Amino acid sequence: MMKTILALPYPPSVNSYWLSRGNRRYISKRGQLFKKAVYHYVLENNIQKFGDKPLEVSIWIHPRSKVLMDLDNSVKAILDSCQDAGLFDDDVQVQALHVFRTDSVKGGGCSVIIEEFHPV
C-alpha cells in the first residue's frame, strides 16, 4: 500500500489563496508561494506519485498562534497544491479526508499523509 508523508509550510486560507478581479479568479501571491513550496518539497524528496488511485488524506494544521481559525479554510489550498505538484491527478480522488488542529508552533505548518484508499 502506497503512503507518503509531507511536512509543509503553513497554508494560506481559501480566502487568501484565491482572489478575484471582475469576473477573473486567480491565485494570490501567497497562494503561489505555497504552491511552489509544495512542488519543491515533492521534487526534492522524490515523492512517489499516486496517479488516479482513490486516496485517503489526513492533514494536521499546526497554527502559528493560539488564535482560533476555521479548520477547513486551508484544506483546499493544500489539496490543490498537492495536485498541481503531481502527487495525484485530481482532488476528486480523495475518498476520505481527516483534518486535525494541533498546538500552535512558531511559524506554523502542516503535516499531510496521503495513502491509497481501501474501503472496509
What are these regions (language model features)?
Residues 1-120:
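Acidic, proline/glycine-enriched N-terminal capping motif
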